[in-house]
């Protein structure tokens, strides 16, 4: 691209895209990307956070995405991004999902209309599942959502929601420092309200700290089984999750 054409493309990109943010109490805010095009050395205000709340996700969108917000007690809501009116940087946003006072939002995904991504959720005790996006009906923003995993004492609370395809691996980091990598293609599709399967085996006293979907490992990178990882190992994992 010529310099002039490149400048036009950059302006169009900035003018036509948005940042969507979500907080722990279920507030969602949408702002034009253009609002952040003149950063300051010490940063700029992006959202007003109410006392006791905190920002947990920020996603770049086209303005036409479908938004899913998931909560710790196992419910998730899906709605069109178009129902969220863009506002300026200085603002608190609107209600994305209604949750009980004892509950909290654990994550948000934004899926574009032509995407082939599925929804993957993971609980704090290592249970997870992959579900077709269409099993989550589109509803009005601000509702209570529908069950996305059957939370039990065995599964523990919901800890992560990710948008994935077979071309992804799931990276799981435990509080002990152990990093586990499992191929998403090994996780079969399951119904929306099911318990799922055991994705990883946690050692006593350990817990999941962070989860991320990453590009799948190539042939040159081996993805090992969690069960083959001995105590004290600091890396790998994956392979076929064990069904419960």
PLM region spans:
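Generic long, charged, amphipathic alpha-helical segments
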Residues: 140-164
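Canonical WD40 repeat/beta-propeller blade segments in eukaryotic WD-repeat proteins
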Residues: 105-106
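Single conserved hydrophobic/aromatic residue that forms the stacking wall/gate
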Residues: 1-5, 9
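Acidic/polar low-complexity surface segments
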Residues: 42-46, 92-97, 142-151
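Acidic, low-complexity intrinsically disordered tails
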Residues: 212-244
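A structural feature that tracks compact, well-ordered secondary-structure segments
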Residues: 18-36, 47, 58-61, 66-84, ...
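Per-blade loop-tip surfaces of WD-repeat and WD-like beta-propellers in eukaryotic adaptors/scaffolds
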Residues: 37-41
